[in-house]
Amino acid sequence: MEFSQKLYQAAKPIINDIYEDDFIQKMLSGDIGADALRHYLKADAAYLKEFTNLYALLIPKMNSMNDVKFLVEQIEFMVEGEVLAHDILAQIVGESYEEIIKTKVWPPSGDHYIKHMYFQAHSRENAIYTIAAMAPCPYIYAELAKRSQSDHKLNREKDTAKWFDFYSTEMDDIINVFEALMNKLAESMSDKELEQVKQVFLESCIHERRFFNMAMTLEQWEFGGKVND
C-alpha cells in the first residue's frame, strides 16, 4: 500500500465524524443558517490567503520544474477558481462574497490550523511535512463531496447541493499531485519519520473538523474577565 493510502485509511474515522457533524449535515439538507455561512466564508477567506502563501513556501523545496509549475497553477486556482464555491454560499446568504469578507475574522480554530501548517513549512526542510499538513484540506473536501453524491439526504432542491458538486470534482488534480509527491518523498524516509508525517496529516484532519464546527458555533476568541457594572 502506498504511503498516501495509509494516510487516507488512518484518516477515515475523522472524516466520518466530520460528515456526521452539524455543518455537513445542515449543508446536505440545505437548512444551514446564514450566520454560520457568513462566519465560514469570513474565516475561510483568511485561511485561503495563508494557504496560498504556503504554496509559495513549498516552491523552493521542489526539485522538479513540473512540480513548481503545478504549484504556481494552484496559487492561481486558490485566488480565482475556488471563489466559485464561495459564491454559491454567498448567494444563499443573499450577499456578495466580496461584501461578506470585508469584515475579517480570525477564529481560534483557523488560527491553530494555519500555525500548524506554517510550523511544518518553516521548521522542516523536507517538503513532505508541509504537504502532509496541507493535503487533508483538498482531500477531505473531496471525500465529503463525493460521499454526498450518493447520499439520499442531499437535497437537490437547495443550492447547497451545488457546493458539494463543485468539490466532488475540482480537488482531484491537487490531490493527485500531493499524493505523488508524498509517495515519492516517503521512499527515502525511515519508519519513525513516516510516523511523524502521519501525525502531521492527522492533526490537520482534526483541524479541518474544528474549522467546520467553528462555523456552527460562530467561534471567536474568548478572553474572559467580563467587567460587571
Curated annotation (Swiss-Prot):
Residues of the site described as Increases nucleophilicity of active site Cys:
47
Q: Does the keyword Hydrolase apply?
A: yes
On whether Hydrolase is a keyword of this UniProt record, the answer is yes
Recorded GO MF terms: thiaminase activity
According to the UniProt record, which cysteines are disulfide-bonded?
none
Q: What class of enzyme is it?
A: hydrolase
InterPro entries from the UniProt entry: Haem_Oase-like_multi-hlx, Thiaminase-2/PQQC, Thiaminase_II, Thiamine_Salvage_TenA
Q: Where is the active site?
A: 137 (nucleophile), 208 (proton donor)
**Alphabetized Pfam families for the sequence:** TENA_THI-4 (PF03070)
Q: Which family does it belong to?
A: Belongs to the TenA family.
Q: What is this protein called?
A: Aminopyrimidine aminohydrolase
